[in-house]
Structure formats: C-alpha cells, structure tokens
C-alpha cells in the first residue's frame, strides 16, 4: 500500500505567499510547526516509516509497542516523529538520533495529525480524517502517541497570519 499515496507536504504561510500563484483559496487546518520527522504507519503492520518509505530502525521498539496496542482497523496513521526536548531548533540533532541503525531513540513520541481509513486516499475531507485520527489515538492509549491539536480552521489568509503571529509571539513557529 505504501506506494499508492504520495507524501503530502505541509504548507507554510510565509513560503506560500512568496509564490507567484499561491494556493490560498482553500480552507486549511492550522497547526503549530515543530521540528520533527514526517512518518507514517499502516495498520495492521504498525511499522513506522519515514518520508522515504523506509522503516526507521531507531524507533523499532515504539513500532512494537504500538503493534501490541493497535486497534482493529486498516488504514494509514500520519504523524511527526518527535523527541521530548527537541521540538524547536534542534532538527539536526533529532535527525542524527533517528538515523541510528541499531540504537533505539529515547523519549520519542508521535504527533498524529491524520488517518486514512481503509487506505481510501484522497476521498475524504481532511477534517473528517482528523476525527478518525483522534479516535485512533484514543484507542491506542499510549503516551507516546499524541494527537497534534488543531489551532484553527479557516480559508482566510488574514486569520492564518493572525494565528502565525500569535504563535510567534509565544516563541513558537
């Protein structure tokens, strides 16, 4: 199943507005940006994969833990792989830790933001998929699997900018 769906990239407002034809005519969910690795796992196998669609050896123990608590569903869980204390301005260190071939990463967790039920790619609105993700995170019930909170939903670039400024005023990205 992994080759069916292309990896979706997050849009960053300041980069999008610099484009000749910015894609700003849709409704978007707003999340705070953190320094993490894009990852996904497919149910029922529960093997954590990177953007390059490779298994990540440094989080094998987390894959095994999730597999032991997996709900009886089929689909793809999409998330950022994070390490406590490495969320802001420490991507290069996080990258080195997650690139390890034999040593397990410590204090690793997943910030879940999407779930594609039954591998029905691109047939369901993002907010409905997020509601499925919420249910899956609750059913897994592990502190290492966390829901990434939505800060807002809007199709108004002024609201996006106001949210970005609010986050930046608190030291976020």
Set out the residue ranges of the language-model regions.
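Short, motif-level signal for alpha-helix interfacial/capping segments enriched in acidic residues
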Residues: 14-18, 91-94, 155-161
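Short, basic, glycine/proline-bearing loop/turn elements
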Residues: 1, 139-151
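Amphipathic alpha-helical
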Residues: 150-173
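Charged, flexible boundary elements
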Residues: 1-25, 30
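Covalent nucleotidyltransferase
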Residues: 20-143
């Amino acid at each position: 199943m992994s080759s069916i769906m292309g990896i979706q990239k997050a849009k960053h407002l300041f980069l999008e507005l610099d484009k000749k034809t910015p894609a700003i005519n849709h409704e978007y969910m707003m999340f705070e940006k953190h320094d993490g690795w894009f990852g996904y796992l497919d149910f029922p196998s529960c093997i954590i994969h990177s953007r390059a669609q490779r298994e990540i050896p440094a989080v094998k123990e987390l894959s095994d833990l999730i597999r032991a608590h997996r709900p009886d569903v089929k689909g793809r869980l999409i998330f950022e792989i994070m390490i406590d204390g490495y969320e802001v301005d420490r991507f290069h260190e996080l990258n080195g830790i997650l690139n390890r071939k034999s040593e397990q990463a410590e204090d690793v967790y997943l910030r879940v933001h999407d779930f594609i039920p039954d591998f029905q790619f691109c047939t369901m609105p993002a907010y409905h998929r997020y509601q499925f993700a919420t249910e899956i995170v609750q059913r897994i019930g592990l502190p290492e699997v966390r829901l990434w909170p939505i800060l807002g939903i809007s199709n108004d670039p002024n609201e996006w900018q106001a949210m970005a400024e609010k986050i930046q005023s608190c030291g976020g990205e």
